[in-house]
């Protein structure tokens, strides 16, 4: 598996992204993988990598980039910690359709320049918070 990272410039700032694609000759069908409200974490990245193993170039953008540099979410205590819940909800509130559509234009442009990705047709998947964004 080829894993990497890239910063994609949008109208609202620089989005840190993870990339995955199978080894060997591409280009591979492109997929944008929208995260859930728990953010970028090992479980989410493992899911994106599994998708890439099926023959896709997967881009996983950190949709919380508008919050600036933020401390990693504490998934172990989130359920019982009102302060952590409030912090997550503040970041989720920044993920709105209009902003994501602007970001998506930059992600599509990234695929057009990426030789390992097919940019003619691009899939979008999302989980939880990312599901409605994918639609």
Predicted features and spans:
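N-terminal cap/leader regions of alpha/beta-hydrolase-fold enzymes
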Residues: 1-135
């Amino acid at each position: 598996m080829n894993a990497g990272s890239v910063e994609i410039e949008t109208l609202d700032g620089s989005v840190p992204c993870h990339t995955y694609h199978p080894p060997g000759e591409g280009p591979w069908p492109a997929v944008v993988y929208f995260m859930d409200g728990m953010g970028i974490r090992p479980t989410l990245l493992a899911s994106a990598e599994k998708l890439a193993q099926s023959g896709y170039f997967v881009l996983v953008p950190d949709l919380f980039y508008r919050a600036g540099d933020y401390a990693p979410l504490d998934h172990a205590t989130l359920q019982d910690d009102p302060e952590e819940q409030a912090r997550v909800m503040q970041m989720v509130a920044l993920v709105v359709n209009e902003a994501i559509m602007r970001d998506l234009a930059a992600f599509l442009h990234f695929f057009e320049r990426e030789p390992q990705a097919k940019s003619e047709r691009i899939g979008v998947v999302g989980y939880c918070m990312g599901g409605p964004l994918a639609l």
